[in-house]
Regions:
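Glycine-rich flavin
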Residues: 1-112, 145-149, 153-174
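Rossmann-like NAD(P)H-binding beta-loop-alpha module
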Residues: 110-152
Length: 176
């Protein structure tokens, strides 16, 4: 600059970014666990099925919550809260290839790809797209229905599309 100080182009350190994400997730989940413990709420992680009006059988899990441990137990309760979470849909026609990732895998990529194809114009895929666009990836979206974010207010979707149009090279609707 004019004063003799130049700043280079911004650079993203994906490893540090991922580390920060993990810290935030750890704080959030740790905070929820602490609040539950403080209120004497028993938490169980696993796949459950009600076996009575006040009993649930749980097959416990570990890690990300999807790996079954083989341990089952029946939990008695007066009141039950189910925090179901979510799991990405496996598309049977997709090849088993490290370049194909779901939303969980997209949050763990080692580097920012130059180009990405997002299958599905739903909220989660578009959210991932806006993140990777901000990090420098070029994006295309394929959606088999006639509009993005099905189920969302159409007027809001139009505003979102207008505000984010430059993030996406192509949005292909009614496309399989």
């Amino acid at each position: 600059g004019d004063l003799g100080v130049d700043f280079g182009a911004p650079a993203v350190n994906v490893d540090k970014l991922r580390g920060h994400k993990e810290k935030v997730i750890g704080k959030l989940t740790g905070g929820l666990a602490a609040m539950a413990k403080m209120r004497k709420v028993t938490t169980v992680r696993g796949y459950g099925a009600f076996v009575g009006p006040n009993h649930v059988e749980v097959e416990e899990t570990s890690g990300s919550g999807q790996e079954k441990t083989g341990t089952k137990k029946v939990v008695a309760f007066q009141k039950c809260i189910i925090a179901a979470g979510s799991q990405a849909v496996r598309l049977p026609f997709m090849p088993d290839d490290p370049r194909v990732v779901d939303s969980t895998g997209a949050l763990a990529l080692k580097e920012v790809p130059k180009r990405m194809l997002i299958l599905g114009g739903g909220i989660i895929g578009l959210e991932m797209g806006t993140v990777y666009s901000t990090l420098g990836a070029r994006l295309d979206v394929v959606e088999m229905l006639d509009g993005l974010m099905q189920g969302a207010d159409r007027d809001l979707v139009k505003i979102w599309q207008k505000m984010n149009a430059k993030r996406f090279d192509n949005i292909m609707l009614k496309t399989k």
